[in-house]
Amino acid sequence: MSVQVKICGLSTPETIEASVSAGADYLGFVFFSRSPRHLSYELAARLSGYVPASVPKVALTVDADDAMLDAVVEALRPDILQLHGDETPQRLVEIKARYGLTLMKAICVAQPEDPLTAAIYRDSADLLLFDAKPPKSMAGALPGGNGLVFDWSLIAGHRPETPWMLSGGLNAENVAEAVRITGAEAVDVSSGIEEGPGRKTPELIEAFIRAAKRA
């Protein structure tokens, strides 16, 4: 079975169509105002129409309150909510009860103990995403999409009960090695398919998906 691929931070019909044509398994859309990939609700609603029903839509938010999540769900009609902040297991329980959607919780990794955090979400998250934790010294760092790679050996022997996805600085050149070291069955990419902040290209998308599927 080939590695599953999530393309995150999409913002144009062209890149959505390129992702679908190349075989993306998930399409991600960002709702976080500090991100260059942030979407207005109006644009998200329009872009949603370009996504086939067979490809799950993922809405990424960061410590969003109910009012914001209501607006995101109304605009995008996502299949999955990706929670990329400091949301607690109890907050996930509340979100699940309110929307009934699949929940993906990001776990940011920099130290050996960080992957162990996944255990506290065992009963509340449907999916996990291991991403690179930005250093405190990094000016303007985002919760994700910084192009940072973490030490993949930190999760090489880590097998959480919850299905998981690998993220953090992946690109067409390093994704095969990342999969080999971690054993990841699914990968997530954003900055690694951009020619500039938030500017994805069909060519980079296709190259990444091709490399990931061959890994």
UniProtKB/Swiss-Prot annotation:
It holds the Pfam family PRAI. Keywords: Amino-acid biosynthesis, Aromatic amino acid biosynthesis, Isomerase, Tryptophan biosynthesis. One of its GO terms (biological process) is L-tryptophan biosynthetic process. Its EC number is 5.3.1.24. GO terms for molecular function: phosphoribosylanthranilate isomerase activity. CDD domains: PRAI (cd00405). It catalyses: N-(5-phospho-beta-D-ribosyl)anthranilate = 1-(2-carboxyphenylamino)-1-deoxy-D-ribulose 5-phosphate. PANTHER family: N-(5'-PHOSPHORIBOSYL)ANTHRANILATE ISOMERASE. This is N-(5'-phosphoribosyl)anthranilate isomerase.
